[in-house]
């Protein structure tokens, strides 16, 4: 049982790590492309900078929320796992 709990916990931690890394990478790319497009739009039409800035900020907030959701899922995988208490006991030596 202890070995299975440890394997499950390692899988959860690995999945959480890869998940947040992929989410951060994707969000970074998306935000960079959005900022690039907004800067080009303001350069082409400076009079519309207010509307472009507001739209860009709303879009960036939406993109950032995706990364926050990935962080929440990663934290749930790590801390709300049913095997967390067992693995914590193993690591602190209380399991023996």
Swiss-Prot record:
Keywords: ATP synthesis, Cell inner membrane, Cell membrane, CF(0), Hydrogen ion transport, Ion transport, Lipid-binding, Membrane, Transmembrane, Transmembrane helix, Transport. The keyword Cell inner membrane applies. One of its GO terms (molecular function) is proton-transporting ATP synthase activity, rotational mechanism. It comes from the Bacteria. Its main location: membrane. NCBIfam families: ATP_synt_c (TIGR01260). The record marks 64 as: Reversibly protonated during proton transport. The gene is atpE. F(1)F(0) ATP synthase produces ATP from ADP in the presence of a proton or sodium gradient. F-type ATPases consist of two structural domains, F(1) containing the extramembraneous catalytic core and F(0) containing the membrane proton channel, linked together by a central stalk and a peripheral stalk. During catalysis, ATP synthesis in the catalytic domain of F(1) is coupled via a rotary mechanism of the central stalk subunits to proton translocation. Key component of the F(0) channel; it plays a direct role in translocation across the membrane. A homomeric c-ring of between 10-14 subunits forms the central stalk rotor element with the F(1) delta and epsilon subunits. InterPro entries: ATP_synth_csu_bac/chlpt (IPR005953), ATP_synth_F0_csu (IPR000454), ATP_synth_F0_csu_DDCD_BS (IPR020537), ATPase_proteolipid_c-like_dom (IPR002379), F/V-ATP_Csub_sf (IPR035921). The keyword Transmembrane helix applies. F-type ATPases have 2 components, F(1) - the catalytic core - and F(0) - the membrane proton channel. F(1) has five subunits: alpha(3), beta(3), gamma(1), delta(1), epsilon(1). F(0) has three main subunits: a(1), b(2) and c(10-14). The alpha and beta chains form an alternating ring which encloses part of the gamma chain. F(1) is attached to F(0) by a central stalk formed by the gamma and epsilon chains, while a peripheral stalk is formed by the delta and b chains. It is found in: Cell inner membrane. GO terms for cellular component: plasma membrane; proton-transporting ATP synthase complex; proton-transporting two-sector ATPase complex, proton-transporting domain. This is ATP synthase subunit c. The chain crosses the membrane at residues 9-29, 58-78. Belongs to the ATPase C chain family.
